[in-house]
Structures are given as C-alpha cells and as structure tokens.
From Swiss-Prot:
Binds to DNA and alters its conformation. May be involved in regulation of gene expression, nucleoid organization and DNA protection. It is found in: Cytoplasm, Nucleoid. InterPro entries: YbaB-like_sf, YbaB/EbfC. Keywords: Cytoplasm, DNA-binding. It comes from Helicobacter pylori (strain J99 / ATCC 700824). Gene3D superfamilies: Nucleoid-associated protein YbaB-like domain. One of its GO terms (cellular component) is cytoplasm. Homodimer. Its main location: cytoplasm. It holds the Pfam family YbaB_DNA_bd. The keyword Membrane does not apply. Belongs to the YbaB/EbfC family. SUPFAM superfamilies: YbaB-like. This is Nucleoid-associated protein jhp_0031.
Length: 100
C-alpha cells in the first residue's frame, strides 16, 4: 500500500468539508415559499428546513377545517421543496467531488 498518497487524501477531504460548509451556509439563506387555498395560507422555509414565516388569511379563522387542510398542504409542499433542494445540492457536491 502506498501511504504517500494519504496526504493528498487529507487535502481532498479538507476541500470537501470546506465546500460542504459553504453550500450549507448558502442553503441557510435560501427561502422556499409554498401557498395553498389560492394564497390563503403561505409558509416559508429556509434551506435547513426551518419554518421562517407563516401567513394565514383572516377569513380562515372562522373555518378550522379548511385552515387545517390548507396548512397541511402548504407545509407538505414546502417540506418537499426543501428536500428537493437538499438532493440537488448533494448531487452537485458529488459532481464537484468527482472532478477533483
């Protein structure tokens, strides 16, 4: 086994860690907004999957069932958008890793 290449591997891993940290920081600032009920409910998630904003039209305060349905729909759509973005970032990072 040629141990002389381990130094290069360490540098490669450091590069991957740095790129991952940069992507994670960029992802944190990305906002994904989903709406349901014709815009009566709007939710926004950051790239880390944290809910950062929630808007509910006042007219829904009288209709609990509709509000629940619209909230679930908007939250599920927002969560899917965050997950899709995470997958894309991971594939991009793997693509960049393959180039090294």
């Amino acid at each position: 086994m040629d141990f002389s290449q381990l130094g290069g591997l360490s540098g490669l891993l450091d590069g991957v860690k740095k790129e991952f940290s940069q992507l994670e920081e960029k992802n944190k600032d990305t906002i994904h907004t989903s709406k349901s009920g014709g815009g009566m409910v709007s939710v926004s998630f950051n790239g880390l999957g944290e809910l950062v904003d929630l808007q509910i039209d006042d007219s829904l305060l009288e209709d609990k069932e509709a509000m629940q349905i619209y909230l679930m729909s908007a939250l599920n759509d927002g969560y899917k958008a965050v997950e899709e973005n995470r997958k894309n970032l991971a594939f991009n990072m793997l693509g960049n890793f393959a180039k090294l």
